[in-house]
Each structure stands twice: as C-alpha cells, then as structure tokens.
C-alpha cells in the first residue's frame, strides 16, 4: 500500500496520516508484526513519559514504535520465519530492514525523531548492533528507548517456537543487557517503571485486544 495524503507535509496531521497508512500496510502484510509494533508503541510512549519527556515528544516516539518494523514487509516470509540459522545473505537482508523503513519515512517527510528511532532501534550500546554500528551516546535517545521496549515485547510474547517470559524474567534479561545491548540509564528507568506499574505488560495486551484493529491510535490517545 502506498499512502495517499491530503494533509500538508510537515504538519502533525500529515505525520499521523502517513503513519496510520503505513501501519495499515504492516497489518495487511503480517498481523503478528503489526500487533508487536502496536505494543511497542504503547510501551515506549509510557517509558518516555515516565522519563520526563513532554507528551507531544513521547507520542511522536510512539509513532516510531508503531512502524519500527515496517522494513520487514519487504523481507520474504521464508527468511522471517526460517526456523534454522540464517545464511549470511539472509542475515544481511534482515539487517537492512531499519534502513528500508527509514528511507520510506524520509520520502514522506517524517520528523527526525521518528526517522532516527526507526533507523537505529537495533543499534547496541557496545557498538555491535546494526545498521551503522553506533555506540553509546551516538545512538539517538529515542532509539535507545525503543530498543528496550522492542526486546521486552519480543521476549514476553509467546510464539509457536518459544514460551513467553514472565515480567520478572524479562526484567532480569533487560537488566543483564545494561551496558552492552542497552543504555544503562534507560534500563534503570525501565525497571523503575515496571516496579511502579505492575500492570505494564497487561496494559499493552489489553489495548491490543480491546481497541479497533483499524485504529492504531486508540492506545496512544488514551492519555497515557
């Protein structure tokens, strides 16, 4: 699906319209990825607000969460769902998905906050991530938040090939990654948020199940 816009580029309405249509293209291609992106958007919105981000900035980061895996819609299912180890070429294909998403978002004049977060959400604090091998503070802050929330949702969501971790187990796994995979300060804030909001995981699942599948904004406009 190619988004068809009638809003003026650079406006909030334009941003929302583009993200809505791109999120719908993810849903049409792969409902599992769409639901993952929705939950990550909810989680990163809450984390950003907990860390003191202004409401508007947090919601913009949530939009990045909503389409952070957009690039996977160009990766063949045979690669995405492959149960065995990936070949070098297949791994390179997977590792290009943030670049492909960012290029499309750039073409639609999305804000830098969204572009940076989507492009860099697989970078690691120790510099061993992709696509650019950024390290430490060179990684955009929004991407550092998005990375933690992305991994949290992956490990707490059941899949046919793995059981879901409990919140306690996931909390420990995220903490183990502080200073290597993740920004230690973001991890510290995230664990405090989990302690302060025992319903954190449930909230993401509740929004997913209770809201209209064609309205990806319901959770983000709920005042959280």
Residue ranges and their predicted role:
Residues 5-224:
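Metal-dependent catalytic cores of enzymes that make or break cyclic nucleotides
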């Amino acid at each position: 699906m190619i988004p068809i816009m009638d809003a003026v580029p650079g406006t909030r309405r334009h941003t929302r319209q583009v993200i809505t249509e791109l999120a719908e293209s993810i849903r049409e291609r792969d409902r599992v990825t769409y639901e993952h992106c929705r939950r990550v958007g909810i989680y990163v919105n809450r984390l950003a607000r907990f860390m003191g981000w202004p409401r508007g900035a947090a919601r913009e980061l949530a939009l990045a969460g909503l389409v952070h895996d957009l690039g996977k819609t160009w990766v063949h299912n045979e690669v995405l769902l492959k149960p065995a180890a990936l070949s070098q070429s297949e791994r390179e294909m997977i590792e290009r998905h943030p670049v492909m998403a960012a290029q499309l978002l750039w073409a639609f004049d999305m804000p830098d906050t969204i572009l940076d977060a989507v492009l860099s959400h697989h970078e690691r604090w120790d510099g061993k991530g992709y696509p650019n091998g950024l390290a430490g503070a060179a990684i955009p802050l929004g991407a550092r938040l998005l990375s933690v929330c992305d991994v949290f949702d992956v490990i707490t969501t059941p899949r046919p090939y793995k059981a879901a971790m409990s919140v306690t187990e996931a909390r420990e796994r995220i903490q183990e990654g502080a200073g290597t995979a993740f920004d230690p300060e973001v991890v510290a804030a995230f664990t405090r948020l989990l302690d302060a909001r025992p319903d954190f995981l449930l909230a993401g699942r509740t929004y997913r199940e209770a809201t209209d599948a064609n309205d990806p904004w319901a959770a983000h406009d709920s005042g959280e």
